[in-house]
């Protein structure tokens, strides 16, 4: 049997689905979950049983939306291969890479391309990329999204730790938000998140100068803690809330440390409808400042690990939903930068390495607090994937999503040892900690990429991820159709529409009718059915269907509400080299055509030069039969869908 036609099965007595733990059989085809059946359902002889487990818990693969991979340029700190290997061994199937501390930093389209070029052959798990917002780079934002495929942006309100990634001020943020608002409008309301390291400099500077005057001991953790007061976070978060409320674009507070800011975030979201979210990290939910040993700079990070009372309040915010994301903020460095011998918290590099250990770290603490195990899937899979617009493919176990799983034992414990860690720099404050929860298997798109006891992780099948719902420039990976079986099984109209949007531009009269005509035996039958539906529509609906297509010869920005396939078919990537007189001629002819017939001109272009379209359009203008012209345009639309189908299957 062709490997693409093989259906794999994962069976478990303890499967986390829709916030519950229950028995289930999960069917997988081409790396996608195509069905979820009862555990007792019969397995067909031709099916391949990948996992059958009675004791272990099966959850959707973890999504860590805050990881510093540091490649290219600082691969002695970390790199794609070591970071994704560590992720795989920890049940993490998707990671989102921060725009620093790589060199160059990812603040321009050119630098982004440099990062992308460093990725092939090194990804054990799937990876999405963030861009950076710094003073003066707002002109790069749209291109990094629409051509580069970043899934969000990160900026600092305080010095980032490296000079090439300067922090932003209010005017810089507003300038960037103006671009983000325009981008959101062009994408039909879909937005890309702006993430903020929320500390401001003034309280930190004042506290540090006071501590210096007092000759405070830099080896005492309390000295460092006092140098990063909560008020620095609180003021910064208030400012982000203010700007988010003003501009109403999606924002996110990374690594929230100060429990003082929780109430402001809660009120902004629940009282004012501000589209802001917040995350906290493994180390803030596990460590306490009181336990940090004298001079042990492995515990240093910014913002700092705070008091036990603060930790309890962070957990309360997690369980009540104010903080809905838990991430690693994996930020490694070489041991020399930690100044271990000097033990100087004030001068050592700030950052904690924990990518591989997230599930047991959080379960160790969550289990003590009575947090249901199934909630971990929301905190560590669903919410992070939603943050970066990948929840159509990533997150908890759901039909239509990638077949990504972590299979683990929540009752088994282990002691952290450097020999277990797969990151490049293995020094960690978790060394020697006894944690609850052991990962036994990690599955990526239906492929086993890690098993306990096998430290090789031989498969390199990770991919770079982009947001499929933001249709853009053709340097993106080609879009793909789900199997016809999966399409038939979709129960949500919106998901169905998103799929057939690759064949037909979004037009409700056609999409609604097709949804009601399921199941289809093949995509060819679906297209044939679409043609029959179109022929039966009234004139108004026919015009709505044909007007869903972009105009021939429009600029790249005007195609962005249409599908990415439409973008390629019209050769928009070559627009910059086209004679402007040709585009002007096409614009005039389009206007004449629409004025005469009352709908858009549609022709099967498929990459032909635009100058070859002009005589076709001129000839069609000579047609005086509106109905004949309308039917001709719709027939061309069907030919377009047939051509697309050949490319997509």
Swiss-Prot record:
Write one Gene Ontology MF term: zinc ion binding
| Post-translational modifications | Carboxylation allows a single lysine to coordinate two zinc ions.
One cellular component term from this protein's GO annotations in UniProt: cytoplasm
Gene3D superfamilies in the record, alphabetically? Metal-dependent hydrolases, Oxo-4-hydroxy-4-carboxy-5-ureidoimidazoline decarboxylase
Q: Where does Zn(2+) 1 bind?
A: 66, 68, 154, 329
Question: Its pathway?
Answer: Nitrogen metabolism; (S)-allantoin degradation; allantoate from (S)-allantoin: step 1/1
Kindly state which keywords UniProt assigns to this record, in alphabetical order.
Answer: Hydrolase, Metal-binding, Purine metabolism, Zinc
Where are the N6-carboxylysine modifications? 154
Chain residues that bind Zn(2+) 2: 154, 197, 255
Q: Name one GO biological process term.
A: allantoin catabolic process
**Required cofactor(s):** Zn(2+)
**Cofactor: binding details:** Binds 2 Zn(2+) ions per subunit.
The keyword Cytoplasm belongs to this UniProt entry's keyword annotation: no
Reaction it catalyzes = (S)-allantoin + H2O = allantoate + H(+)
Instruction: Report the EC number(s), separated by commas if there are several.
Output: 3.5.2.5
> What InterPro entries does its record include?
Allantoinase, Amidohydro-rel, DHOase/Allantoinase_Hydrolase, Dihydroorotase_CS, DNase_TatD-rel_CS, Metal-dep_hydrolase_composite, Metal_Hydrolase, OHCU_decarboxylase
Q: Which family does the entry's similarity section mention?
A: Belongs to the metallo-dependent hydrolases superfamily. Allantoinase family.
Q: How does it assemble?
A: Homotetramer.
Q: What is this protein called?
A: Probable allantoinase 1
Q: Which gene encodes it?
A: allB1
